[in-house]
């Protein structure tokens, strides 16, 4: 097929030669196009690849940032014209080649006699037209189209053999290539962007959104979160690695976390149980508390009056606060909030520091001790004589 195309181009150039060429005619280089041992099916093959007029969207589902102008197309498989029978076609091709050889000899003879006799310009043109007409008829008899199927959008040359129709234009198959890698696309699927064709691999590498986790192009479903795009399987908790469910996620320092881990790691902790505080809470002693956890550290009684006493970072009721401080009256067992008397390692309300026998207040602070009890001097002398 390529030899016949070259022959047609050579013959067309011959018809356009001016009068200067007749003064020294050169033989057509037909010897360069000798017949090859090829199957007639290959010689007479006609391929027409039709383009879909309504290309599919580039990203079919779940994409959020692929522009609508990106188009995914697929050219139809090549279709061949029914070839003539091998026997008759081979005979016609032999006859055609013999005719061309004869014409070559005639042109060579005219070249040798060019100095003695210059052929008439009209006779030469008529001869070439006749030869071309006969060649076109014989090619048509073989089922080979002699009228160009259009001009290639890449090289701008006529297309006489296989043709691809894509992007609203015609192409030589070898010239319909990926804009980026220059690999031949042929009838393979391709993507269109801004009027240019791309193979699927290059299109995704150049234009598809990329996963914020693995940085690879996202070819199918895409998840958008935190102003980034992700493969759905790559959007998971930064702590436990679990993929997020219907409950969603929480963000901290530009990282996603599931609810459980987020609360465990970043929510305020109760000062009593050290568990996350989610709803109602109390704020005291520079921390937060579950209401049920804010109780006395000894008796676990809640502070109904709203007042409490702090000791070593823990809340206490008044009684147990003074008990831990050692400020309970040894006489009545109640907290001492005012003046007190210290004796025998204990503290007493002044009114409760009395003689254990006569109950007289030891106001002067003079007393006698016996068996961990206080006595005034007269009672002590009576009860414990020497």
Curated annotation (Swiss-Prot):
It is found in: Cytoplasm; Cell junction, Focal adhesion; Nucleus; Cytoplasm, Perinuclear region. The keyword Signal does not apply. GO terms for molecular function: metal ion binding; transcription coregulator activity. A motif (LD motif 2) lies at residues 70-82. SUPFAM superfamilies: Glucocorticoid receptor-like (DNA-binding domain). Keywords: Acetylation, Activator, Cell adhesion, Cell junction, Cell membrane, Cell projection, Cytoplasm, LIM domain, Membrane, Metal-binding, Nucleus, Phosphoprotein, Repeat, Transcription, Transcription regulation, Zinc. Residues 13-41 are annotated as: Disordered. A motif (LD motif 1) lies at residues 3-15. The modification Phosphotyrosine is found at residues 22, 62, 72. One of its GO terms (cellular component) is cell projection. Transcriptional coactivator for androgen receptor (AR) and serum response factor (SRF). Contributes to the regulation of cell adhesion, spreading and cell migration and acts as a negative regulator in integrin-mediated cell adhesion events. Suppresses the integrin-induced tyrosine phosphorylation of paxillin (PXN). May play a critical role as an adapter protein in the formation of the adhesion zone in osteoclasts. Negatively regulates B-cell antigen receptor (BCR) signaling. The LIM domain 3 is critical for focal adhesion targeting and the suppression of paxillin (PXN) tyrosine phosphorylation. The LIM domain 3 alone or both LIM domains 3 and 4 can mediate interaction with AR. Interacts with PTPN22. Interacts with unphosphorylated ITGA4. Interacts with PTK2B/PYK2, PTPN12, AR and SRF. Interacts (via LD motif 3) with LYN and the interaction is induced upon B-cell antigen receptor (BCR) activation. Interacts (via LD motif 3) with PTK2/FAK. Belongs to the paxillin family. This is Leupaxin.
């Amino acid at each position: 097929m390529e030899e016949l195309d070259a022959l047609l181009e050579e013959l067309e150039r011959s018809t356009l030669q001016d009068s200067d060429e007749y003064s020294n005619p050169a033989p057509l280089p037909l010897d360069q196009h000798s017949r090859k041992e090829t199957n007639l099916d290959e010689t007479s093959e006609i391929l027409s690849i039709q383009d879909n007029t309504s290309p599919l969207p580039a990203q079919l589902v779940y994409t959020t940032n692929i522009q609508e102008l990106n188009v995914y197309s697929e050219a139809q498989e090549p279709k061949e014209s029914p070839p003539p029978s091998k026997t008759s076609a081979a005979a016609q091709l032999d006859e055609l080649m013999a005719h061309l050889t004869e014409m070559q000899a005639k042109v060579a003879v005219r070249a040798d006699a060019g100095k003695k006799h210059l052929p008439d310009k009209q006779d030469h043109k008529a001869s070439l037209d006749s030869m071309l007409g006969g060649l076109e008829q014989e090619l048509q008899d073989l089922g080979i189209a002699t009228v160009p199927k259009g001009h290639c959008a890449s090289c701008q040359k006529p297309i006489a053999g296989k043709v691809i129709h894509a992007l609203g234009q015609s192409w030589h198959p070898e010239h319909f290539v990926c804009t980026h890698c220059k690999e031949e696309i042929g009838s393979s699927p391709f993507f269109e962007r801004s009027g240019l064709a791309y193979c699927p691999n290059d299109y995704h590498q150049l234009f598809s959104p990329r996963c914020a986790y693995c940085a690879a192009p996202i070819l199918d479903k895409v998840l958008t979160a935190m102003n980034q795009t992700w493969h759905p399987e790559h959007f998971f908790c930064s702590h436990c690695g679990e993929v997020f469910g219907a409950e969603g996620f929480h963000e901290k320092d530009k990282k996603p976390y599931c609810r459980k881990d987020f609360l465990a790691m970043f929510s305020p902790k109760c000062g009593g149980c050290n568990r996350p505080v989610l709803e109602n809470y109390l704020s005291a002693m520079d921390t937060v508390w579950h209401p049920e956890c804010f109780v006395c550290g000894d008796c676990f009684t809640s502070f109904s009056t709203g007042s409490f006493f702090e000791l070593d970072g823990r809340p206490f009721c008044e009684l147990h606060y003074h008990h831990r401080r050692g400020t309970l009256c040894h006489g009545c067992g109640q907290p001492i909030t005012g003046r007190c008397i210290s004796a025998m390692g204990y503290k007493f309300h002044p009114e409760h520091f009395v003689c254990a026998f006569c109950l007289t207040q030891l106001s002067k602070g003079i007393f006698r001790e016996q068996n961990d009890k206080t006595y005034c001097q007269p009672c002590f002398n009576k009860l414990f004589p020497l």
